[in-house]
Amino acid sequence: LFFYPLDFTFVCPTEIIAFSDRAEEFHQLGCEVLGVSVDXQXTHLAWINTPRKEGGLGPLKIPLLADVTRNLSLDYGVLKEDEGIAYRGLFIIDGKGVLRQITVNDLPVGRXVDEALRLVQGXQYTD
C-alpha cells in the first residue's frame, strides 16, 4: 500500500508507473500493490487517460484508490493536515494483516521499487 500526494504532480508519475511496470514481480511474491491519494476517482481516470508523453500515467496494472475523505491517509498517519494531502507512505502488510514495514518520505522524495521488493522478500524470508 503506497500513498502519494496528488495526481498530475512531478514525482508521482515516475513512482506509480514504476510500481505498475513491476506489478507482476510483486504478484509472484503474493503481493497486491495499491496506490492511494486524496484525489477523486474522476481525477485518477483523467490522469490514467493522459498519455505518458504528456505527463499522464497511461494504462496501469495496479489500482489507484480515491481517499477523498482523507480517512485512510489520517488512519495510516500520513496526512499532511495543513495541505490536506498525503506524504509518500509505503506500508508492507503481510498475508495475515500484520504491518511489516513503514516508510514515510517527505513530499519531494520519491521511493525506489527495488527497495520495496527487497523489503517484501526480506519479510518473507524471515517467516
From Swiss-Prot:
Which terms in the Gene Ontology molecular function aspect does this entry carry?
thioredoxin peroxidase activity
The answer to keyword Phosphoprotein applying to this record is yes
Q: Which Pfam families match?
A: AhpC-TSA
- Mind telling me which CDD domains this protein's record contains? PRX_Typ2cys (cd03015)
Entry annotation: catalytic residues? C12 (cysteine sulfenic acid (-soh) intermediate)
The source's domain of life comes to: Eukaryota
| InterPro entries per record | AhpC/TSA, Peroxiredoxin, Thioredoxin-like_sf, Thioredoxin_domain
| Location in or out of the cell | Cytoplasm
Task: Identify residues that carry Phosphoserine.
Answer: S73
A GO cellular component entry from the record: cytosol
Query: What post-translational changes are documented for it?
Result: The enzyme can be inactivated by further oxidation of the cysteine sulfenic acid (C(P)-SOH) to sulphinic acid (C(P)-SO2H) instead of its condensation to a disulfide bond. It can be reactivated by forming a transient disulfide bond with sulfiredoxin SRXN1, which reduces the cysteine sulfinic acid in an ATP- and Mg-dependent manner.
Q: How does this chain assemble?
A: Homodimer; disulfide-linked, upon oxidation. 5 homodimers assemble to form a ring-like decamer. Interacts with TIPIN.
**What else is noted?**
The active site is a conserved redox-active cysteine residue, the peroxidatic cysteine (C(P)), which makes the nucleophilic attack on the peroxide substrate. The peroxide oxidizes the C(P)-SH to cysteine sulfenic acid (C(P)-SOH), which then reacts with another cysteine residue, the resolving cysteine (C(R)), to form a disulfide bridge. The disulfide is subsequently reduced by an appropriate electron donor to complete the catalytic cycle. In this typical 2-Cys peroxiredoxin, C(R) is provided by the other dimeric subunit to form an intersubunit disulfide.
Q: What exactly does this protein do?
A: Thiol-specific peroxidase that catalyzes the reduction of hydrogen peroxide and organic hydroperoxides to water and alcohols, respectively. Plays a role in cell protection against oxidative stress by detoxifying peroxides and as sensor of hydrogen peroxide-mediated signaling events. Might participate in the signaling cascades of growth factors and tumor necrosis factor-alpha by regulating the intracellular concentrations of H(2)O(2).
Q: Mind telling me what this protein is named?
A: Peroxiredoxin-2
Gene giving rise to this polypeptide: PRDX2
